[in-house]
Amino acid sequence: MSLNPRINEWTGRVVWLVGASSGIGLATARQLHDRGATVVVSARNAAAVEAFESSHPGSLGIALDATDRDAMKQAAERIVARCGRIDFALYCAGHYAPMRASSYDLDEMLRHESVNYVGALYLLDAVLPVLIRQKSGHLSLVSSVAGYRGLPNSLAYGPTKAALINLAQTLYLDLHPLGIGVSVICPGFVATPLTARNEFKMPALIQPEEAAREMLAGWAAGRFEIHFPKRFTRVLKALRHVGDGLYFRVIRRFTGL
């Protein structure tokens, strides 16, 4: 069942991706540009943003820190001034460092909150007035299967991704009646600079290009939650529905932690 308007045609759509200097964000920006979208990329890495703009004619690069509220607002104003509207906004900025309770680091916890969750709130603050005024558009937040239930090494990361899932669900309830689409992306393991920090063999690891294709397919199907690769994510989705005792036993057995 389609929960959002299906997006099959990207030509001329103004798409803003925050966190697009590498990994999933960069791969998605490239594929959207190839499909004719007017792509705006933002990230802290100014050199990467400039490189994308110079190599993708018609695109716009705006370097910013996702944790800078004023910069996010100014970027949205710049996009509207240049393009007249924002049709699609994707928040894919992220921070990840493995953490367990025995090595609790409050500063690192708050860094995860700032980048992964509060940055998304800053994007909403910048684009929601535009989308509501337009009575059209789409918001998409990149969460993770780590947001489904607690996982070892995900003490800092997992709660921020769970918050994004809840945020997207609530946004959908509020914005769908206004004609605005909302989706949440829940990837498994994708080969990015963030997952490179893991010291274990990641099951069902995929490349960012495959992740981007899955996302575009999900938007084309009008899905609310887009999760992949399904050979891995379906298992974790099923585990959301088992009792706590069984869940903890299964996770300990398969992770060894």
Regions found by a protein language model. Give the residues of each.
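Substrate-binding pocket helix/loop in short-chain dehydrogenase/reductase
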Residues: 100-113
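Active-site helix of classical SDR
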Residues: 124, 160
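Rossmann-fold cofactor-recognition segment
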Residues: 55-70
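C-terminal helical subdomain
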Residues: 184, 200-235
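Conserved glycine-rich cofactor-binding loop
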Residues: 21-22
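Conserved glycine-rich Rossmann-like NAD(P)H-binding loop of the short-chain dehydrogenase/reductase
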Residues: 35-51
